[in-house]
Amino acid sequence: MKDDLRKIDKILLFLVTLMCIFGLVMIYSASSASTILRYYVAPNHFFVRQLIVLVVGYVFGFFVILFPTNRYKFLAYLYSLFVLVLLMYVLVKGKIAGNAQSWIAIGPFNLQPSEFAKSALILFMAVFYNNLSKRNTKNLSLYFIPLLLAGVYMLLTLLQPDWGSAAIIGAIAILTFLSVPMIKKNILKIMKIFVIGIIVLALALLYKGGNILSSNKLSRLNFKAPCTRYQEESGYQVCNALIAISNGGLFGVGLGQSSQKYLYLPESHTDMIFPIICEELGSIAGALTILLYGVILFKIFKIAKRSDNLRTSILAYGTFWYFTLHIFINLFGLLALIPLTGVPLPFLSYGGSYTLNAIFLIFVTERVAIENKKNKLKREIMSI
């Protein structure tokens, strides 16, 4: 046990923990007004709930670190099936909030199955492709099975509807799929299949697009200046996010002194927490936050590159894409560069289901780092 713990990537774990602590501070600050004015609860309500989730996540993560990835086989398939059942259940018995039926109420907490679908998909792909590589099969059609699972996850998530999570599930599946060696060798054949798929999807959208996309969703594709669109109501959130960033200047107005959190900026403690950081602590703090994300992503990518088997490689690459997609979609959305979809910012945004999955994947990556070092040591001993 001690030997395993010594092999973790200490810098990665330190940076993630630092971001989580910073996130707690900003969640308390960003939600201090809305807790009283909107939710009618104590000012520390979301802070305490997030702290509980983090403690649970880190305790569970300790066991994840000690659990070898070669034992994921049955658990990955069982986890994927369990998430599939949850995604179907939420459509029937789920809690409706924010025009989406995406949550399952469990006591005082709400479970969001679409968040667990992301980590379940990564584990499923890692185990499935690793098993397939051992069979040395050249049947390309078998490699598309995880994409079928991703498609089912996406469809069930779209029915809630949760466009942001559905897009990330699909993107994780495709980007991880393209990192498989067998797929890289047959990239031209694969691209032909993707082109056909895109054409079919485009025709389906042309035929049924009006029924799939509501006027609210279509309005988010309007990229003219968000504060001009504010008069049409579709640019309200982005406009107030940009106002918050502008208010902060270089050094900010001071911790806890945001004016936009007084219900001007909806969900300021969740997917809109970055503008509050910039308003209270300044653009310099915002830039440092992005820099820390860059270092975390670099560390995860290095762990993926050092993996010497397909299972651990896909686990780390899947985690890399998971965080990269969340960071870029969140930041690009609030800067009006892409449609706003309500995607949380890793380690900073409030959210139990997302935080648990983010922490879980970090500790899975730490387990991969441990196994990388163990395998390297074995090779060195054998070469003597």
Predicted regions, residues:
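Alpha-helical transmembrane segments of polytopic integral membrane proteins
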Residues: 21-27, 122, 126, 294-297, ...
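Membrane-helix boundary/helix-loop-helix interface segments in multi-pass membrane proteins
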Residues: 2-12, 18, 25-28, 33-160, ...
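Hydrophobic, glycine- and aromatic-enriched re-entrant/interface helices and adjoining loop segments
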Residues: 97, 103, 189-285
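Interfacial segments of multi-pass membrane proteins
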Residues: 167-187, 256-285, 344-359
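Loop-to-helix entry and N-terminal half of a specific, functionally important transmembrane alpha helix
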Residues: 302-342, 348
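Hydrophobic alpha-helical transmembrane segments
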Residues: 52-60, 280-297
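Hydrophobic alpha-helical segments of polytopic membrane proteins
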Residues: 77-84, 140-156, 163-209
